[in-house]
């Protein structure tokens, strides 16, 4: 990675404004999954061990520039205190007198968490006044929030332009895993793209077709491709306006010598529910009033065998409606294939990360990305503003 990292900074006695991604799921004020907090620990622990005064900033949810009591970061501060084994101070303001006072009292190795940065309308607008307030709090800037790296906000890009700015350990790990995969892949290189809609994955599919040996398609978006092949798909998800594009992608794959792999059978249901009647049918035999909600058993075997023969696999998007157990089998089969492959497995955040967590397979993967939108944009070949704003080595 050609950006400065925390290893390039002298942090002892310095105030370090550290953008983290603590956007964790909450239920009744309790954190239900602390993965993102744990992911930031290596950076926080290195900074505190080296005697920095660590000022942590994060968003939580979408308060849209106003104070939403349920989205305060107090539960996060409590959980972080437990994980670090030391007190984490927390302010009720994002900036202002209370924050200035807390920072002035912070000791070397101390940790302070400021309030949810999205309580300020200026955060998402990258407002110069808020940027100035953040910059005045600190001597150095560290971005460890890969999950927010695709946002050009005050705490991700604005302040990075005002202070010496470096990547944290998680940011570095994410960029190296995804960057090496896309720039210098071991082959055979397989990408699996799932999810509901073609329109959300157009740029990803287009960019990956220039890089991969196998492109496996699953999830709702597969049925627009099946339709483009001339098959009837019943009531399955269809984007009429993307049929021509689907044909273009299949032609591009042919020209590039990419093995473009679509489902050969599907689990169809007579209703979108857990209680629906279901059956497995070949892909060209979907009944007119049924819809396909998961890949079938032959498809699972086919996809699994391609994964097992690959040296590198990137996966983004589920194979079916995995939130309903009746239609989770395809996603689970792919997750199990990735867990058991000898090749390097990368899970591209979002629903795929949620799926491998659900099936208890996250530990078996080589890299599970913490950023859904950010990893998607990185896979599209886009420049991430939060990364671009950091100092070059």
Curated annotation (Swiss-Prot):
Name of this protein: Phosphoglycerate kinase
Family to which this protein belongs: Belongs to the phosphoglycerate kinase family.
Pfam families recorded: PGK
GO MF term list: ADP binding; ATP binding; phosphoglycerate kinase activity
Classification via Gene3D superfamilies: Phosphoglycerate kinase, N-terminal domain
Residues that, per the record, bind substrate: 21-23, 36, 59-62, 118, 151
Localization in the cell: Cytoplasm
SUPFAM superfamilies, per the entry: Phosphoglycerate kinase
Cellular component aspect of the GO annotation: cytosol
Catalytic EC class: transferase
Catalysed reaction, written as an equation: (2R)-3-phosphoglycerate + ATP = (2R)-3-phospho-glyceroyl phosphate + ADP
Residues involved in ATP binding: 201, 323, 349-352
E.C. designation(s): 2.7.2.3
């Amino acid at each position: 990675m050609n950006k400065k990292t925390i290893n390039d900074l002298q942090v002892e006695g310095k105030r370090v404004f550290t953008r983290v991604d603590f956007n964790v799921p909450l239920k009744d004020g309790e954190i239900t999954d602390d993965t993102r907090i744990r992911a930031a620990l290596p950076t926080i622990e290195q900074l505190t061990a080296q005697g920095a005064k660590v000022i942590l900033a994060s968003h939580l949810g979408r308060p849209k520039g106003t104070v939403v009591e349920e989205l305060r970061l107090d539960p996060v501060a409590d959980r972080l205190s437990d994980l670090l084994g030391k007190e984490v101070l927390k302010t009720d303001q994002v900036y202002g007198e209370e924050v200035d006072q807390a920072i002035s009292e912070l000791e070397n190795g101390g940790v302070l968490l400021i309030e949810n940065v999205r309580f300020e309308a200026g955060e998402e607008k990258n407002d110069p006044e808020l940027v100035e307030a953040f910059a005045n709090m600190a001597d150095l800037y560290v971005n460890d929030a890969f999950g927010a790296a695709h946002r050009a906000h005050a705490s991700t890009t604005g302040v990075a332009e005002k202070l010496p700015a470096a990547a944290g350990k998680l940011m570095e790990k994410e960029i190296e895993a995804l960057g090496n995969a896309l720039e210098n892949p071991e082959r055979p290189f397989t990408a699996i793209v799932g999810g509901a809609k073609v329109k959300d994955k157009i740029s990803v599919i287009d960019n990956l077709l220039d890089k991969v040996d196998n492109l496996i398609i699953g999830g709702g978006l597969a049925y627009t491709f099946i339709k483009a092949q001339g098959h009837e798909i019943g009531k399955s998800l269809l984007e009429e306006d993307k049929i021509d594009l689907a044909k273009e992608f299949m032609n591009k794959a042919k020209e590039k010598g990419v093995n473009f792999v679509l489902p050969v059978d599907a689990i169809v249901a007579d209703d979108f529910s857990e209680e629906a009647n279901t059956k497995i049918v070949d892909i060209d035999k979907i009944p007119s009033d049924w819809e396909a909600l998961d890949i079938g058993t032959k498809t699972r075997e086919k996809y699994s065998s391609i994964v097992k023969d690959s040296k590198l696999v990137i996966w983004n998007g589920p194979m079916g409606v995995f939130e309903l157990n009746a239609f989770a089998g395809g996603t689970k089969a792919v997750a199990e294939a990735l867990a058991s492959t000898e090749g390097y497995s990368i899970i591209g955040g979002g629903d795929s990360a949620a799926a491998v967590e659900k099936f208890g397979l996250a530990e078996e993967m080589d890299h599970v990305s913490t950023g859904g939108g950010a990893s998607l944009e990185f896979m599209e070949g886009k420049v991430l503003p939060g990364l671009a704003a950091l100092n070059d080595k």
